[in-house]
């Protein structure tokens, strides 16, 4: 029996999203529960994968099944594809298993040609509608299938409106639209070299192929990387009978949410346009009306829609994002999905759904994307500064937050200015999916057109970016990179501030303050902490960082980088003296100047942590990073050392390395200069003793971490220095104190010999930044030059420095955990690379049995939630 690549909506259900994609599975589910859905079928994600395996061709087997299901649709609808008597028109939409709003391409009104449009015009008695559908189809097909840019057609529309003296597309007559369709086809022929296709089946296969192709377009690739959506998933294609919202004033189209996606409030929020097609709302071309006004225009359809909203939310137990069309007063549902929402809304909805009995606490914790918590910690406008400011304009508060920066008018400029370290606000007439990289680079987005459900608003909410849309008072001049608002002209580089909660726009920069964490945040985090087994620590070198991390729920310091403490002005001079010393005695004299500073730093950290664990990594970077580079500083050092400038320069030159990442650094420094390790040990132990004396009820157990071990004898050598020094300090103080000595596991050889290393270590901590560099054999600082090409070639899907490589690096980690614990059952194991704040990496750490992850302070909530989700999923999956 042939493999099944196509399913009628009536053959699927919501559990088949891996095969049918999210949109197809939900269309099937809505069909099954009796909602008014235009009939159609779904071409599976497997067909998309097969398309790529067959060299970007749709094979004969899949083509035959598509044609078979077109015939089934004809039977169901009583219409025929490409027929002149009763033509069937369809939409072709993408639908991956994970929602990707605005990332993929859609075609409406497929099946039209010059003859069919004349039949429709005559039979419907509505020629304007028929020609409007045809000109839209030509434009969409040209853009999506043949890659002729929309802009060429927009110019023709603008010229026609100017010629006819009208402002809106809906004011153009049937004759105007017929003329436009002719112009569009001429434009197509000029760009492509052939006539616009008139055969319905040829159109359909071109459209299906285009949707498959769009899975690999640049904006889809960017969105997938940002949202951890694997390339291998592919997209499904939904072919659906058209419902027309553009037949006249008793028709319309809209998008709605069962709850407010910006705040989470339990009230329907949405927008609709009369005499329009679906893409008009989400594309943000016209600014739509609030959904409540639909009650006046289409009272019966509105009443039915309110009931549908209730049915869908009760069915899916989550906030729904729905697309619908009203044709001649009759409601048709085109889509439902779990709606994108801001982080504050996600928390509010999750807490409310538990209170309403829709979700358990476990399910509520699983609802929230940990990465979105980041946005809760973003700055807000200072209340006093905001009160003193007067808005110069107002739009729709489409995605909350505060954004201020310099104005730019294109996504490319936003990226370029951001790369130069400038904060920018991207101002656009209307946002298109191609702007995604610019939206990522900008602090916030301001659009002239579009509503709360436009592409800009939906994607901004998903990214946690502040967005104000639909500020129609702006007179935009994109060509000259300026706009006028409230009588003032703003040029590229001028500063504005926007408030994504209120929709207000302000001249200049308004002071921002750190966000306050809401009660819902505390509730969700409380639930998360109940379920997780993985501890979450922080990477912190200063008391301020440590305090902030504790505020956000950190349970200790997993990495304190001591080298950062050497760079301060009052101690760098002494450290440079140490580097340029000739003997161990001279080095010790210089290090003794630094000792009280280091001790003071550690005491402050112990105070900030109040007895929680503090893991201190000994000096790691190569010495050349600490030496002076300017002539003046070199002369000052020579004077302090009483050495000629030439000798100091020779010492500095001697520190130069061809590959410093793999050079004289980490434990190699401690082997060469054991006095450095001895000084740092004294500082750690003395600080701990003083803290313990001040706070006898605190459990102060210093953790000393020796970096870059690749050979067990290195660890034994440096540990011997540490233990002798520490024991002598403890004995001299006359106290009893426990301490631990462990190592960073960041060299592949350390993973391979973890069994031996574990016998001599109290703990392991994976330094996954270096472990990734050394396993792949490329530098984190240089990888950016070629990773883009690797993404394009599908060699990598993600940056291995941001998302842990579980296949290679992960295999080494798993081996080190298993071999380490087999030889030292008490071994405590954590991770302190950047991966400690990445949700998928945190899940991997849970699954291989780590005790803790450590991440930067502001990523602590992300890791807490990710750890809880990992524990819940592991329990559910047995």
Language model segments and positions:
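Glycine-rich phosphate/ribose-binding loops and adjacent secondary-structure elements
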Residues: 330-332, 425, 429-440, 444, ...
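Extended, non-globular alpha-helical segments
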Residues: 394-434, 485-523
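Short beta->alpha connector loops at strand-helix junctions that form conserved
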Residues: 41, 448-450, 469-472, 560, ...
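Flexible inter-domain linker/hinge segments
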Residues: 208, 215, 377-409, 523-538, ...
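Nucleotide/phosphate-binding sheet-loop regions of phosphoryl- and nucleotidyl-transfer enzymes
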Residues: 1-389, 416, 422-425, 432-437, ...
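Structural motif
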Residues: 238, 408, 425-427, 446, ...
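Conserved alpha/beta-domain cores
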Residues: 93, 517, 527-878
């Amino acid at each position: 029996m042939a493999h099944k690549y196509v399913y009628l909506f009536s053959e699927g259900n919501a559990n088949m999203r891996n095969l049918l994609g999210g949109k197809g599975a939900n269309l099937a589910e809505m069909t099954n529960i009796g909602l008014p859905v235009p009939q159609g079928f779904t071409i599976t994600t497997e067909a998309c994968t097969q398309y790529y395996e067959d060299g970007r061709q749709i094979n004969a087997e899949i083509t035959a099944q598509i044609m078979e299901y077109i015939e089934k649709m004809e039977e169901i609808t009583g219409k025929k594809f490409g027929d002149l008597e009763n033509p069937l028109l369809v939409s072709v939409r993408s639908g991956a298993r994970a929602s990707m709003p605005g990332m993929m391409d859609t075609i409406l009104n497929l099946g039209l040609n010059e003859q069919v449009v004349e039949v429709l015009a005559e039979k419907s008695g509505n020629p304007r509608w028929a020609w409007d559908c045809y000109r839209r189809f030509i434009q969409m097909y040209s853009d999506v299938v043949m890659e002729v840019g929309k802009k060429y057609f927009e110019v023709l529309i603008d010229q026609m409106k100017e010629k006819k003296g009208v402002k809106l597309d809906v004011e153009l007559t049937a004759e105007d639209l017929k003329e436009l369709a002719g112009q569009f086809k001429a434009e197509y022929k000029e760009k492509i070299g052939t006539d616009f296709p008139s055969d319905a089946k040829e159109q359909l296969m071109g459209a299906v192929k285009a949707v498959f192709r769009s899975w690999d377009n640049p904006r889809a690739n960017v969105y997938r990387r940002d949202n951890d959506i694997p390339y291998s998933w592919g997209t499904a294609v939904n072919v659906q009978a058209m419902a027309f919202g553009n037949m006249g004033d008793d028709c319309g189209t809209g998008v709605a949410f069962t709850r407010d996606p910006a705040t989470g409030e339990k009230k329907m929020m949405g927008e609709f346009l009369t005499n329009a097609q679906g893409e008009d709302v989400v594309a943000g071309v016209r600014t739509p009306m609030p959904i409540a006004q639909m009650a006046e225009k289409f009272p019966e359809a509105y009443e039915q829609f309110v009931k549908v909203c209730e049915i869908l939310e009760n069915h899916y137990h989550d906030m729904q994002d729905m697309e619908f069309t009203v044709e001649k007063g009759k409601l048709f549902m085109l889509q439902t999905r779990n709606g994108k929402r801001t982080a504050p809304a996600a928390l509010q909805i999750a807490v409310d759904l538990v209170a309403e009995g829709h979700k358990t606490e476990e399910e509520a914790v699983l609802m929230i994307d940990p990465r979105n918590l980041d946005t809760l910690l973003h700055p807000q406008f200072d209340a006093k500064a905001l009160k003193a400011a007067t808005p110069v304009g107002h739009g729709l508060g489409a995605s909350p937050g505060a954004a201020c920066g310099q104005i730019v008018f294109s996504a490319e400029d936003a990226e370029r200015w951001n790369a130069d370290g400038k904060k920018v606000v991207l101002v656009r007439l209307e946002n298109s999916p191609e702007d995604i990289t610019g939206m990522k680079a900008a602090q916030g987005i301001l659009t002239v057109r579009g509503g709360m459900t436009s592409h800009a608003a939906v994607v901004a909410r998903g990214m946690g970016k502040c967005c104000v849309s639909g500020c129609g008072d702006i007179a935009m001049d994109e060509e000259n990179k300026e706009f006028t608002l409230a009588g003032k002209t703003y040029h590229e580089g001028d500063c504005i501030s926007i408030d994504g909660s209120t929709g207000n726009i302000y001249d200049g920069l308004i002071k921002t303050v750190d966000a306050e964490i809401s009660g819902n945040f505390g509730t969700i985090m409380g639930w998360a902490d109940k379920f997780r087994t993985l501890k979450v620590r922080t990477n912190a070198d200063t008391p301020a960082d440590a305090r902030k991390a504790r505020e956000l729920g950190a349970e200790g310091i997993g990495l304190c980088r001591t080298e950062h403490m050497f760079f301060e002005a009052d101690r760098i001079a002494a450290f440079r003296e140490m580097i340029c010393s000739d003997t161990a005695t001279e080095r010790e004299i210089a290090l003794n100047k630094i000792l009280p500073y280091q001790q003071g730093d550690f005491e402050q950290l112990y105070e900030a942590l109040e007895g929680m664990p503090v893991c201190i990594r000994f000096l790691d970077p190569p010495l050349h990073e600490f030496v002076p580079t300017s002539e003046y500083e070199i002369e000052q050092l020579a004077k302090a050392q009483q050495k000629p400038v030439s000798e100091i320069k020779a010492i500095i030159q001697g520190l130069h390395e061809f590959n410093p990442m793999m050079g004289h650094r980490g434990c190699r420094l401690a082997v060469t200069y054991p006095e450095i390790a001895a000084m740092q040990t004294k500082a750690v132990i003395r600080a701990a003793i003083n803290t313990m004396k001040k706070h006898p009820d605190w459990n102060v157990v210093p953790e000393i971490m020796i970096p870059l071990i690749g050979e067990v004898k290195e660890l034994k050598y440096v540990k011997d220095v540490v233990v002798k020094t520490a024991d002598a300090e403890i004995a001299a103080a006359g106290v009893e104190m426990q301490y631990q000595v462990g190592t960073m596991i960041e060299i592949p050889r350390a993973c391979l010999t973890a069994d031996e290393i574990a016998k001599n270590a109290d703990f392991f901590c994976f330094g996954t930044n270096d472990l990734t560099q050394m396993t792949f054999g490329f530098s984190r600082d240089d990888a950016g030059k070629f990773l883009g090409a690797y993404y394009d070639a599908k060699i990598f899907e993600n940056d291995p420095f941001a998302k842990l490589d579980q296949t290679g690096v992960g295999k080494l980690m798993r081996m080190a955990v298993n071999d380490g614990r087999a030889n030292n059952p008490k071994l405590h194991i954590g991770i302190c690379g950047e991966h400690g704040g990445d949700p998928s990496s945190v899940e991997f750490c849970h699954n291989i049995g780590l005790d803790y992850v450590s991440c930067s302070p502001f990523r602590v909530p992300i890791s807490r939630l990710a750890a809880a989700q990992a524990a819940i999923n592991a329990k559910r999956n047995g």
